[in-house]
Each structure stands twice: as C-alpha cells, then as structure tokens.
Regions:
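Beta-strand-enriched, solvent-exposed domains that form extended recognition/catalytic surfaces
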Residues: 2-209
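Short, hydrophobic/proline-enriched secondary-structure or compact coil segments at domain edges
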Residues: 103-114, 185, 214, 299-311, ...
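Low-complexity, Pro/Ser/Thr- and charge-rich linker/hinge segments at domain boundaries
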Residues: 200-232
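Residues that flank catalytic or metal-binding motifs in active/ligand-binding sites
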Residues: 210-213, 242-244, 302, 372-373
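Active-site-proximal beta-strand/loop segments in catalytic clefts of secreted hydrolases
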Residues: 217-221, 251-253, 307-312, 337-339, ...
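A short alpha-helix/helix-coil micro-patch that ends at or immediately precedes a cysteine
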Residues: 228-249
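Active-site-proximal segments of metallohydrolase catalytic domains
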Residues: 245-338
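The catalytic-center signature of Zn2+-dependent metalloproteases
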Residues: 333-426
C-alpha cells in the first residue's frame, strides 16, 4: 500500500510504502460442550502438558504423549492436530452405520496471537478433491469477522494469558463412505489472493471396522434380585467403542449359572469363599469358568465372557483391602455388586480389549495422574481420594486407544454380518 504525505516545512509531497501488520492466530477444532461419546474426538488438552491456573500438568510423560499426535508449525507455534472418527453413513459399505448419519457438530476456537481486526479475511476448510464425495464439511468457509463478534475468553496457560474466541457447534462434518487412509481437513486463511494455513483436523480412516462378541452370564448365588442396567448396550453402540470404530456386540444375553441349592462340594466351598471374600480374583474367574463348563456350557476362545453377580468382592491393593466393582482376567470380565452400572461395564470391556489404566506405567503409553482425565479407563477418584473433576462425564477414548483396540486378537476384521440390524435397530 502506497501512502502520500505532505511535509509541513517545505510543502513537499513524499510517497512511502506502508506495510500492513500481519494478524496472527490459530484455529482449533474442539468437541461440543454436551459431548457424550457420540463420535471419536481426541486432542492435546492444555492441561496435559501446560500449567493451567497454577495447576501442574497431569501428564507425567509428555515426550511419549507428543508422539501420539501429528504436530504442525503455524506462525512459529506448535500446533497439535486433533483427531475425529466417524462411522461411515453408507449403504454401499458393508460396515456402514446410521449412528453418525448426522455427522459431528464441532466448536471452532480462534486463538489470538496478535491483536485482530476485521480485515476481510475468509477462513476456508479444504479437503483433498479425492475425498470430496466422502467427507463433507458445512459450511465450507466462514468470515474471520464471525469470531470477532464473539467475546474474548482468557485462559492462563503456563503463566501467560491467552485470548480465545469460540464459535459453538459451528461446523458439521460427515463421513459418507470408505476412507482407505486418514484424511486431513486444512483450515486456510485467505485474503487478497494470499493463503496461510492456521489449523487442521484429521479424520480417522474407516476401511476397517472390527467386531467383538460379548456373552453375558448371570451368576446367581442367592435369592436377592439383580440385573445389568437397561442402557449399557446402547452405550456400547452410541457412546463408547463407536469412537474407536469398533463394533462391540452382545450376542448372548440369557446365559445363567445358578449355583443356589447345589450340593456339590466344589460349589459349596467356592460359595463359602466367595461370600466370605476369601478368594483372589484369578480364582473367582477360574471357578466361574469351570462351573459354567461343568453345568454343560462351552467357553469359546474368541469371545469375551462377562460374568456378573451380586456379591461384594474385596481385593488387596498396595497393601490395602479395597472393594472392587469389577475386574478383567485373561480377556474375560467379572462384574461385582458395586459395578452393575454402565460406566463400569464399559471400563472393564475396555480392559478386555487390551486397554490399560492411563495412570499405570506401560511402554510407549502416556502416563497420567490418577483420576484426572475424562477417559473411560481412568478412575473416578485421584490418588489422594479426591473426586475426578470429570466424574459423571467420563465419555472419551484416546486416539492411541483406538489403535490399541484394533490390535486385539479377539476382534474379527473379516466377517459376514449375521446381525444386520446391529447398528440401526436396538
């Protein structure tokens, strides 16, 4: 831009080029406020690796954590790309589903790096043309001014105040078919023919949707009534493992192991030990399986058996006897009296599919403080007995958990859909 000035002393006119100050910002995709696990979404939360309002980071191994995210550099800022996973809404894909037929509504967050003004910049969402028929984003562009109309939110991150502006439920993303590989949605700021990337989202590939088969076994040891919650199968389908594009299917619901009034010494001794809480968890599972077979049933290797009963069980944990809601042993599950709820069932199925507690140390898996994340496999209490800040809203699975689930040997990747209504009719 050329500007002309008149010098007062001489009246001489002078021309000079004015350089416009570069406006810098980043745009992040984020989950909607009322998210309950309807689709997979994972991102590098600030609290994982930064000091938030004087609270120390909750991830103990940030160097491992970083390896699980794609990292970009925009405006000399480290940018962690979030992940989105949607079940393909397609009748042509044999694993197509109507669960995510409405797509995912996401928030957009603008992070200010410099002071901003309405300069006519447009924000465009770009998808490779090869995937334009399969991945749909609405709208395809917005004006920067839309952000500037929103109030500024200030967050103190690592002792620095960061300004954000949020457009809630601003974009909708749908997957309408098979993605043979992960697909990026790039966020491009455009003005006067110039482009600058300021954000990105990666859509998880949909070419493999494995299946896990669950067999429920009700173990009756007394006359007190008990049952599993009515909503847990819905949650398996709509609020949990769908995030990992994994089909967890209960194929048998009416299996019963009734141990009441049995005279066999094996049964009598086991019930005495069970009810007096004098038995280790491996022995509980061993006895349930042996008695299940003894009374005419079979144990199939590639199925997950979930035994549930109404006895309290206590286990030794770091020198302390604690009541346990449930546990997984050698790929099968036992749910005890205190665990007959949807969250515990999902937590234990996660273990059966190979997931580890995020607060226990394993090679190449990020380590977190106990009871600090919104992850299904975390605990509702911290190491110090205080409540997890996300209790009641622990609906997420990490992206690396999606990957780990797909490595589980009990899953089937090639199968004929003998239960075609699984995804669509409950």
């Amino acid at each position: 831009m050329i500007a002309t000035f008149t010098l007062h002393a001489t009246g001489q006119k002078v021309s000079a080029e004015l350089k416009e100050i570069e406006r810098k910002y980043l745009i992040h995709f984020r989950r909607p406020d009322k998210y309950e696990g309807e689709f997979g979404f994972d991102w590098m939360r600030d609290e994982y690796i930064e000091i938030i309002d004087s609270n120390i980071p909750i991830c103990k191994t940030p160097e491992i954590l970083e390896k699980h995210y794609e990292i970009r550099n925009f405006h000399n800022q480290k940018y962690y790309v979030p992940w989105l996973a949607l079940l393909p809404f397609s009748t042509e894909h044999k694993y197509g589903s109507s669960i995510n037929k409405d797509g995912a509504n996401l928030n957009l967050e603008l992070q200010e790096l410099t002071e901003l003004k309405n300069d006519g910049t447009k924000i465009v969402f770009k998808i490779d043309d090869k995937f334009s028929d399969v991945v749909k984003i609405t709208p395809t562009s917005i004006e920067l001014s839309e952000f500037l109309n929103e109030k500024v939110e200030v967050r103190n991150i690592s002792q620095e105040d960061i300004n954000y502006r949020v457009l809630k439920n601003k974009v909708n993303i749908k997957c309408l078919g098979v993605l043979e590989k992960n697909v990026s949605i790039k966020v491009i700021a455009t003005k006067n023919g110039k482009e600058q990337q300021v954000g990105e989202l990666i859509l998880f590939k949909t070419n493999k949707i494995p299946k896990a088969k669950i067999i429920l076994v009700k173990v009756i040891t007394n006359d007190e009534p008990f049952s599993l919650p009515n909503d847990f199968e819905y949650a398996l389908k709509y609020k949990s493992f769908n995030q990992a594009l994994t089909r967890v299917e209960v194929i048998a619901r009416n299996q019963v192991l009734d141990l009441r009034n049995r005279k066999e010494k094996t049964v009598v001794d086991f019930l005495y030990d069970l009810q007096s809480q004098r038995i280790k968890k491996d022995k509980i599972m061993e006895n349930f399986k042996k008695l299940y077979i003894y009374f005419g049933k079979k144990i199939y290797e590639n199925y997950i058996y979930l035994f549930y009963h109404n006895n309290e069980i206590s286990l030794l944990d770091k020198g302390i006897i604690r009541k346990t809601k449930g546990f997984t042993y050698q790929g099968n599950i036992i749910i005890n009296l205190g665990g007959l709820n949807t969250h515990t069932i999902i937590h234990e199925i996660g273990h059966a599919l190979g997931l580890k507690h995020p607060f226990e140390e394993y090679e190449n898996i990020p380590l977190f403080e106990k009871g600090t994340t919104d992850n299904y496999i975390d605990y509702e209490q911290t190491e110090y007995g205080t409540e997890n800040p996300h209790k009641g809203k622990m609906f997420s699975l990490f992206k690396w958990q999606w990957d780990n689930i797909h490595k589980n040997k009990k899953l089937k990747f090639s199968y004929e859909d003998d239960y075609k209504s699984f995804w669509d009719i409950f």
